[in-house]
A protein has these predicted regions:
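Rieske [2Fe-2S] iron-sulfur-binding domain
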Residues: 1-90
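C-terminal catalytic domain of Rieske-type non-heme iron oxygenases
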Residues: 79-269
Length: 269
């Protein structure tokens, strides 16, 4: 993986193409890059001594996902590395759970999107599966997992239109909200014997836009035939989330005041 910004005129390299010599060609002026270093400039004699180009990043495949370390440039050997592992939820290794995955392009900063996922108080006011008659969480508890992660546990009354109520038959659900810096959130909902866990990764692709990746694990309705149902549920949930996120004023996204129900977002910051 390399930086997307051509060093000539700043064009997006992802719009280019891979040539037969395995170089990436810039779509603007045809500069060619090999592992981030400039290999050929149209109109100039090729040189094997070129040691300039764009940053090259380490990539790693974990749990069928591709991760990039954008803080360290392999070519220049400059940047920062951090001693932490990539988080993989226990559900990923549990044969009793099925998984679906997806992504959403959202015109909002990535930190605000992740904070919304961790927000316990918005559930009943924003989401159709919430309980507007009993919207306030109870029995809340927050604990630091380590210096880079934390976890909130709380309970709330199951909404009449929620899977927890309809399928799980639960009057009350237990929710575990976790974060693992820099960008992982985990929301685990337990309703009697059924468990649904949503893991998200959110990264910026511009000043005010991001890509949210999600994995949904469940230990019920495990047949692939049921996957479209959960994809639809995630689409509806993200539609409701983005609708409210787009109504937040750009200059006031961090708000002015916080309550005890904002503990997870505050710790995440």
């Amino acid at each position: 993986a390399i930086s997307d910004i051509c060093i000539h005129r700043g064009s997006s390299l992802s719009g280019g193409k891979i040539l037969k010599n395995n170089c990436l060609q810039c779509p603007y002026h045809g500069w060619e890059y090999e592992k981030g270093l400039v290999k050929h400039i149209p109109g100039y004699v090729d040189s094997t001594n070129r040691n300039y180009g764009v940053p090259q990043f380490e990539i790693k495949e974990v749990n069928d996902d591709i991760f990039i370390r954008p803080t360290f440039d392999i070519n220049s050997k400059k940047g920062n590395t951090y001693n932490h592992t990539i988080y993989v939820p226990p559900e990923a290794k549990d044969p009793n759970f099925s998984r679906i995955s997806g992504k959403r392009h959202i015109i909002r900063p990535n930190n605000i999107i992740s904070e919304n996922v961790l927000d316990m108080m918005h559930i009943s006011y924003v989401h159709s599966f919430g309980n507007s008659l009993s919207p306030v969480p109870f029995n809340m508890k927050y604990d630091d997992i380590n210096e880079l992660s934390g976890k909130s546990t709380f309970h709330y009354t199951a909404g009449p239109n929620s899977m927890s109520k309809i399928i799980g038959g639960a009057n009350y659900v237990t929710v575990e909200n976790e974060f693992y810096l820099p960008d992982v959130t985990v929301t685990r909902v337990t309703a009697n014997n059924i468990v649904k866990t949503i893991v998200t990764h959110c990264y910026p692709i511009g000043q005010n836009e991001s890509i949210l990746h999600f994995d949904l694990y469940r230990n019920f309705l495990q047949s692939p035939v049921c996957d479209p149902l959960f994809h639809y549920q995630m689409k509806l949930t993200l539609d409701e989330d983005t609708q409210i996120l787009y109504r937040i004023y750009d200059d006031y996204m961090l708000g002015f005041m916080s309550t005890k129900f904002d503990i997870t977002q505050i710790k995440y910051r």
